[in-house]
Amino acid sequence: MTGFLGRAQGLGRLGKILEQAGKPRVRGCALASVSVLSLVVMSVAARAQPTGGSVVAGSAQISSSGASTLINQSTSKAIINWQSFSVGQGGSVQFNQPNASAITLNRVTGTSTSVIDGAIRANGQVWLLNPNGLLFGNGATINVSGLLATTSDIADQDFLGGRYNFSSTGGKGGISNSGSITASNGGSVVLSAPSVTNKGLIAASAGHVAMTGKVWRS
């Protein structure tokens, strides 16, 4: 899969996972303990949707109707900065992308945790970057070509240039999954934060799943 998992050396079990994926370099990783994750989650309306979306690179159109948000992307990569990115129960976010290797980078610039309790669907890859943390609730159903959920960040030009060097934001947010995350055949799922908890289902047939600690720029 053309994507975000990459070559790494001397990282034990995680390093082997990344070696098998054979994509960009990440260093300074450690497997996160699957422990109780403390997330201070702000009250989110039952039908909350992403807000304040601004396309800062690539070509994409954002439209919303009720509890549904649609992103039509026509370039292989796009960057969207959001004030907040949550999906309430019964809500959905649909990404229509050129192909399975296309990537939409969604960066939260506000101060709230992303609470996903609805559906995210994409025929390509979805990256969710939020230094405040991400919570996939019991109602979350994610069906994508590939998913990266992280509290780290990446420079726009690095992302666009295929240099997938992530840096810590210094935030204390974590990631918790109690829902269902599915990557298409050969796809990958990566959850990366200071602490990561998985109590749900993560499936990546013939692909890779990784839960990592802090990811530092190489």
What kind of region is each of these model predictions?
Residues 2-218:
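Solvent-exposed adhesion/ligand-recognition segments of exported proteins
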